[in-house]
A protein has these predicted regions:
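Patatin-like phospholipase
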Residues: 2-7, 12-107, 142, 147, ...
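Extended hydrophobic secondary-structure segments that form protein cores and membrane-embedded regions
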Residues: 5-8, 38-44, 123-128, 207-219
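Active-site gating loop/helix substructures
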Residues: 13, 93, 117-198
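Surface-exposed acidic, glycine-flexible loop patches that form ligand/cofactor-binding
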Residues: 29-34, 108-123, 198-203
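A short acidic (Asp/Glu
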Residues: 52-53, 188, 219-223
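Short aromatic-enriched loop/helix-cap "lid" or pocket-rim segments at secondary-structure transitions
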Residues: 77-79, 221-224
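Surface cap/lid and interfacial helix-loop subdomains adjacent to catalytic sites
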Residues: 91, 96-122, 186, 208, ...
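Hydrophobic, mid-to-C-terminal alpha-helical segments
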Residues: 175, 193-223
Length: 224
């Protein structure tokens, strides 16, 4: 029996692209994404979409969220450190570029108080444990041997996965200080496949993955 995994990469505001692709799946194929996949994984901006699908939020609503609140999420904070040449390094170390409170507000409006323990679909949201120098993978409580995250609010897990260093502040969840899952799994497909095999006992040959990226930024280089 085929085990279908949906994996969504990180990529900041470019998350609108996989959200739009999934919107086309819904409209052109007439499918419900939550019912069409057996496991969902997302990193960074992909975690917003993955968690949304796991909560049975339509992709069209996720597209609207990016368009309406993208500017709020990527809202540059006003620096409290006076700008001087010698303070540039200090600013980079002590202040994130964007206001994490704005991201928190948007995620709260989307996910409210839903907890990972409320989700029945296998959900994988990678983050990075910068306090202990390791990986941290949030999971819904689909495995009775893995109940660590059942009381964690989805918005907290998503914010941790989204908190790219220098762009957003690290996010604390319980005793863990967490940052962007893209530091080690910007494409979470492999993490999902491994979990399906080890946790659920799915044979490798039975696994099919739909992995959606966020494209690439075009950067122009020139002489200084």
């Amino acid at each position: 029996m085929t085990f279908k995994i949906l994996s969504i990469d990180g990529g900041g505001i470019r998350g609108v692209y996989p959200a739009h692709i999934l919107k086309c799946f819904e409209e052109k194929l007439g499918i419900n994404l939550l019912e069409s996949f057996d496991m969902i994984a997302g990193t960074s901006t992909g975690s917003i979409i993955a968690a949304g699908i796991a909560c049975d939020i339509r992709a069209s609503e996720m597209v609207s969220m990016y368009r309406e609140h993208g500017a709020d999420i990527f809202n540059k904070r006003k620096s409290k450190i006076p700008f001087k040449k010698e303070s540039v390094a200090t600013k980079l170390m002590l202040e994130s570029v964007y206001d994490s409170a704005s991201l928190s507000a948007v995620l709260k409006s989307v996910f409210q108080e839903i907890k990972l323990g409320d989700i029945t679909k296998p959900l994988i949201l990678p983050a990075t444990d910068i306090g202990n120098g390791g990986v941290h993978v949030f999971k819904s409580a689909y495995d009775t041997n893995f109940l660590r995250d059942k009381l964690v609010k989805i918005r907290d897990a998503v914010q941790a996965s989204c908190s790219a260093p220098t762009f957003f502040d690290p996010h604390k969840v319980d005793e863990y200080l967490l940052s962007d899952g893209g530091l080690w799994a910007n494409n979470p497909a492999l993490a999902a496949v491994i979990d399906a095999q080890k946790r659920l006992g799915i044979p490798y040959d039975d696994i099919q993955v739909v992995s959606i990226g966020t494209g690439h930024s075009i950067v122009a280089y020139g002489l200084m």
